[in-house]
From Swiss-Prot:
Protein name, as recorded: RNA-directed RNA polymerase catalytic subunit
Region of interest called Disordered, as start-end residue ranges on this chain: 50-82
EC nos: 2.7.7.48
Region described as Promoter-binding site: 249-256
Uppermost EC category: transferase
GO molecular function: nucleotide binding; RNA binding; RNA-directed RNA polymerase activity
Catalysis performed (reactions): RNA(n) + a ribonucleoside 5'-triphosphate = RNA(n+1) + diphosphate
Amino acid sequence: MDVNPTLLFLKVPAQNAISTTFPYTGDPPYSHGTGTGYTMDTVNRTHQYSEKGKWTTNTETGAPQLNPIDGPLPEDNEPSGYAQTDCVLEAMAFLEKSHPGIFENSCLETMEIVQQTRVDKLTQGRQTYDWTLNRNQPAATALANTIEVFRSNGLTANESGRLIDFLKDVMESMDKGEMEITTHFQRKRRVRDNMTKKMVTQRTIGKKKQRLNKRSYLIRALTLNTMTKDAERGKLKRRAIATPGMQIRGFVYFVETLARSICEKLEQSGLPVGGNEKKAKLANVVRKMMTNSQDTELSFTITGDNTKWNENQNPRMFLAMITYITRKQPEWFRNVLSIAPIMFSNKMARLGKGYMFESKSMKLRTQIPAEMLASIDLKYFNESTRKKIEKIRPLLIDGTASLSPGMMMGMFNMLSTVLGVSILNLGQKRYTKTTYWWDGLQSSDDFALIVNAPNHEGIQAGVDRFYRTCKLVGINMSKKKSYINRTGTFEFTSFFYRYGFVANFSMELPSFGVSGINESADMSIGVTVIKNNMINNDLGPATAQMALQLFIKDYRYTYRCHRGDTQIQTGRSFELKKLWEQTRSKAGLLVSDGGPNLYNIRNLHIPEVCLKWELMDEDYQGRLCNPLNPFVSHKEIESVNNAVVMPAHGPAKSMEYDAVATTHSWVPKRNRSILNTSQRGILEDEQMYQKCCNLFEKFFPSSSYRRPVGISSMVEAMVSRARIDARIDFESGRIKKEEFAEIMKICSTIEELRRQK
């Protein structure tokens, strides 16, 4: 039967049709090769936007630096980074006038957090630039390496201390004449394989000590490593993102804590909240503008876009903002917060891996590392790359480029939001003192501007004034990419507003389906995604039921666990059929064991094991949840786990799901190929670390430590604890005399070994 598709929309309000416009099927684009070119683009563009600033030279590192602050006011619409200090300070003052006490309260909250935060805060986060190895590492490893080096250089670094104490060490490290670090290197040699008699390359990892003088250390401490941003849709060109090292991270964290606290108190801020809370907050601002506009007034909304937000922001401006916000606070607090922007004013961008060259005729490939770009003959490069390198050369030092202006992506999202909101705040009638007024929403570089005025000329004047005010603080609204419409229809941070925020369900489509973690987690994540979309994204009951059936089908095909009574033949069907026949209560079998699906849209919140527990055969229960089952590497499973789901737009989201430990919650083993790389030493360190921590937690089950505090104290603690426990157990008759004697002997041996060492 032919269906006329327009009939489907007869009863649907126009705004609900947004889900049919979904363009993002298929995989997003990923980047390959080096990010060196993109990073050079960023550095060159940033300098171009500030080119009329003043050049100075950093006395410590010798890096040339460009300072556009209080530079010439722009004469055209080109993006520029010439923020005016007095304008920024005035915007801050007006923001405080509109929200009495906001800065002081936020400072008090932050001060409390600064004094309580422990150093492990820095282990959160993904890849981090590890200055000791000069490349990226997982955050925890980078922190451990930094602390190790600090300690061997006579600083008091302590892994379980306060973050503020670690930051004191960072400050001291910058005053040292030199720092000694341990780096990893690899040796390659050709050997003959005994088995295959072929020649193979063997790699061995060595560690060597290296001394960095003050200048080299400072360059590394101020370095941001760069990578290419992956999985960005709707862009032809890739772009670079930055990852700072451990010296900068702690300071940035405190600044962002302060800014977050301020953003929470500003109704125009789209950060730090998200989801429905954000929609409610934003809908409020729109409602306010609609109700306050008299019947005769016009109201227009701009769906705004800023040109190169990060590259025109300036850390020196952030320093001015922080100086103002904390002006009534104690000296130590002001100092701690001002270090991050100062470090960013002196930052260096690491150019990444360099360029790959290949000669098709000679079948040769060679890599030109970034360090060589300063001296290599440019005749090997094509024209566009040659231009980039020529432009960046004056800024190069040791494979990094001096980048004083600009912020790099994702660094001070909260603080830059405060700056944006301070301009929106100036739109109140009592400040504009004319017939037009504005308000709006700001979330990092994304904004929506609502302008009210008696007539079109007033609207135009309001927009112009907003545009020019933004220019004064280094914000460049893009006239080409911003769109104005009658208030009631606009887009902000991928939320579409049409008389209320419209649920764009299609955005969530990529996160439906089977993740491939393990049978247990996948089942749980799958139903949670459907449940969440019923709550948040207008996923109706009929569609949800269909999504559920499709999910179960997908799940069964992924794990080849079709029902025990099916005709489908897979590699697993023999075992599953046998299990089906032996099971009395077939409804109790999990779907992953060939059982029926008992989920419907009413019970999505119950983990499958709980849902079927009463229906299971007793011996099946015993096998399924047997912690001693030798085939399962049981990690300790928290009652709630986190999964990463990929919506179509925006960053990967973390989503909670219920975790029940069964024989299906297996953990895949680590890929062996890492054992042949330079990461191997790190892997071994990590495993040692893990073993020590596990052992420690066995002795101190209530241990709130996550990591050892200096090796000696740890061993001593465990030995003395073992002795106490053994004596108690012996006296209460839980262990025999021989066992007690043996434990005591082992303890003495350990102490003896430590003395000899």
